[in-house]
Amino acid sequence: MFLLAGFLGCIYKYHEKEIVLEFGMFTGSNWDVASASSFVMIDKAIAKFEEEHPGVRIHYYSGISKEDYSEWCARKLLEGKMPDVFMVPDTDFNLYSSLGVMKNLDELIEHDAGFNRNDFFTTALDAGKYDGHQCALPYETVPVLLFVNKSLLAKEQIEVPGEDWTWDDMYEICRKITKDVNGDGLLDQFGTYNYSWRNAVYTSGGRFYDGDQQQLPFTDSHVLDAIKYMKRLNDLNQGQSVTQEDFNKGNVAFMPLTFAEYRTYKTYPYRIKKYTRFQWDCITFPAGKEGENRSRVDSLLMGINSNTKHEKLAWEFLKHLTGNEEMQMDIFRYSQGVSVLKSVTGSAQAAAIIQEDMDEGEQVINSSLLYNVIENGVIEAKYQQYEQVMNLADGEISKILMENRNADSSMKIFQRSITKYLQQQR
């Protein structure tokens, strides 16, 4: 009798054996700003999931920095111990997708009646696509906005631009702002700092790469228009270099800034360390003649190990992190990013959370502006040669601007060298 009871007990325990899902994550912020709460929202999400799924435990390794995470993943991959669900580094997304490290989610999405693609921002969801297939889901997103020094504009009796302003509008503002204030023969005020030709291309109506991630020519008219526009802006500075110190002192009108930086430096305690000498806010980027008021949008992605033994649970956990409104609201509570769900980011609750830590009288960024900037944003390519090519282009265009070279002929020569370079990489 006792033997039978013991045998039945063993069978019961076997069926009730705990399932452990491995989760891969790094500490801190994905957006290179200070963050002490990255584990809080993950731990809350895990606790909720485990509560809803008795017998399931989520395990992760703490203390892995963003800088070390890619190497940690590579080591786990070689050991055959890749986590069931994991954060996907931007630099590894295309490699992992092409090698089949991440599960193609198309079938899981198609057979899940509760999953709706339209719940997500288009740019955020598209960031997780490879070769037309959904290989990862977005967890958090951050757009680049344009920082405007409202105090400097007010001093020069210039109104803050509206959401649909243009390159010409920006040029005129910069022309009025740029001046020698103290009469020592050197400029003291400037229009822009760190505004680049890439920012201009995004708003020119052109793109660096098409949907298949084939390189568009650097001799494309939109790219050339952006470079020539940058030359006009650069000429206003009369050969002087604009520095971060100029900006910090309140002597520059515009500077690109991520939403993560906006939230960090608008709230305590970091607001007392930066940009306290003047009033500032964020607006859209100006549009070229054939372009729109667009900017880059980055997303933190999560995928499922293609070799997971717990596909259904891994899918449920991935959805729990990325598609659950309660979990996504915690992005606003504990991170400097933005929720990937339209309903959350556009909500009054999200706006109230952002407003909580701001000084009285500070106006929170317009939620409709934030919504539109993300939905209509630009996704940068993730494949290996992209940043190498763009860095080479940065150097070439810097020479065009600094040495007063002809943009058309210089970019034709550059295009030939880049085409040859890419052919050698294949």
Residue ranges, per PLM feature:
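Long, aromatic- and glycine/proline-rich binding clefts that accommodate carbohydrate-like moieties
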Residues: 332-395, 399
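Paired acidic/hydrophobic, glycine-rich loop segments that form the ligand-binding mouth/hinge
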Residues: 84-87, 253-258, 263-265, 276
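Hinge/lid segment of periplasmic solute-binding proteins
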Residues: 64, 88-143, 277-286, 362
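Extracytoplasmic/periplasmic solute-binding protein
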Residues: 130-139, 144, 168-216, 252-254
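Conserved N-terminal structural module of periplasmic/extracytoplasmic solute-binding proteins
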Residues: 1-95, 99, 289, 404-426
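Short, solvent-exposed loop/beta-turn-alpha elements that line the ligand-binding surface or hinge
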Residues: 106-120, 163, 182-190, 206-225, ...
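Extracytoplasmic/periplasmic substrate-recognition and gating elements
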Residues: 25, 235, 272-342, 378-379
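Glycine-centered hinge/linker elements that transmit conformational signals in sensory
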Residues: 173-174, 212-241, 285
